[in-house]
Amino acid sequence: MSAATTSFPNRPAAWDLPSRGKVAMAGLIIAESAIFTIFVVAYLFYLGKSITGPTPREVLETPIFYTICLLSSSLTIHFAAKCLARSITFAFLGLWLLTITLGGLFLYGTAQEWHRLIYEHGLTISTNLFGTTYYSLVGLHAFHVTAGLIMLAIVAVFGLAGRVSVKQSGRIEVLSMYWHFVDAVWVVVFTVVYLLGR
């Protein structure tokens, strides 16, 4: 008499809930998206309604190079997080520092543009409606880039001290979510201000 074999149905794979850090960052991104939406709508609403100049067409130059720098930083931080998850800490640190460099170049480009607009064209936040909405929208984004760079720099300091390992890969992934958000917002700002707005 042969022993009967019992077959069991395939059990569904366990469903892992996202970490609290990812949930919190997702909530922050949703809230920040609402704020940026208000600023973008305000920019579009007041576009072309300035009584006095200068106008966007007269003074704005398309920051293609600095845009490429910022968008490229999304790739570098993505691969940096992947390297850390695989315990390739040397590559992680190199890509992380490259991300900071690219973000810093973008901020430099923003500062350079503001200097030109203020001192060559006399455009300040109180000059006209365009100045008010332009500096508010672009400044809001620059503030978020600055905040992101500060957080990236803190991680870099710990990384150079040898205190970042695969154990922190989850936190690094959460931080990369914020940086991807900042880059995605710039695509919208760039399109509205430098393409549609001109």
Positions of the model-derived regions?
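...captures the hydrophobic TM-helix bundle architecture rather than a specific catalytic motif
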Residues: 1-198
